[in-house]
Design a protein with these regions (language model features):
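Central mid-sequence intracellular linker of multi-pass
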Residues: 97-114, 121, 127-201
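Hydrophobic core of transmembrane alpha-helices in multi-pass small-molecule transporters
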Residues: 57-58, 69-83, 91, 218
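Short hydrophobic/alpha-helical segments at membrane-entry points of transmembrane helices
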Residues: 66-74, 86, 137-138, 211-213
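Pair of pore-lining "gating" transmembrane helices in MFS-fold secondary transporters
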Residues: 75, 202, 206-218
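Membrane-interface helix termini in secondary transporters
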Residues: 3, 34-39, 121, 125
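Small-residue-rich segments within alpha-helical transmembrane domains of MFS-like 12-TM solute carriers
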Residues: 62, 66, 78-86, 95, ...
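Conserved MFS/SLC helix-loop-helix module at the cytosolic interface between two early adjacent transmembrane helices
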Residues: 28-71
Length: 218
């Protein structure tokens, strides 16, 4: 990030530690996060809560005074973001059949790079025009702007996010809607979301094609 390296006199691997802290937390907390996501009582509230916390930590990064604070906050960002990717598709898969799911999952995947592309231009403009405003460096303003975008959307999630069919019913769904959703699971032979125990992850790790995807990502 422009200006951050110079402000903290970062050298060598110090820049790599930003990603290392984030990735370490992402790896460690993804499985525990998904275990929580599989609980119907938590499924509706967990993702919005994680996004609110992500936004708060993003704001906090704008106020760091040394690089070690930034490392700690990057670790927290990775922790809060860890179950979001898999959790989103877990939630989608609990409501839609295969024929319906690929459109929604595809839209989600398309929006990710589009969002990154647009945010890149916005961040460049913000850095150029806000650098020095309020006595703060441009890179600090980028964290503030990211937080401003994130927190209102995350708070909206408490109202509109449905969780899984067995979660507490949101206001916009009737009892009949919930019954229909559950009957669709049986009609399309969609396995009803259950708790993700450690035995599930053990079975997953024993399947060869999972490791093929791991090496593809590497």
């Amino acid at each position: 990030m422009s200006g951050l390296k110079e402000d903290f006199n970062l050298n060598g691997n110090e820049l790599n530690y930003f990603n290392a802290c984030y990735t370490a937390a992402y790896v460690v907390f993804q499985v525990p996060g998904m275990l929580l996501m599989s609980r119907p009582q938590l499924a509706r509230w967990l993702l919005p809560t994680l996004e609110v916390l992500w936004g708060v930590v993003t704001f906090a990064q704008s106020r760091v005074t040394d690089v070690h604070q930034l490392y700690a906050l990057r670790f927290l960002v990775g922790m809060f973001e860890a179950p979001v990717f898999a959790g989103t598709h877990f939630i989608l898969g609990s409501w839609y059949s295969g024929a319906e799911l690929y459109r929604r999952a595809g839209t989600w995947f398309i929006c990710n790079p589009l969002g990154s592309m647009i945010s890149g231009y916005l961040q460049a403009a913000a850095y150029k025009n806000l650098s020095g405003a309020g006595g703060m460096a441009g890179w600090r303003w980028l964290f503030i702007i990211d937080g401003i975008f994130t927190i209102p959307v995350a708070l909206l999630g408490y109202v509109v996010f449905p969780g899984i069919p067995d979660s507490p019913r949101p206001f916009y769904l009737t009892e009949d809607d919930t019954k229909l959703a559950k009957s669709r699971l049986e009609k399309f032979r969609i396995r009803r979301p259950g708790r993700l125990g450690l035995d599930v992850f053990k079975r997953t790790l024993s399947r060869w094609h999972i490791w093929v995807f791991v090496f593809c990502y590497m």
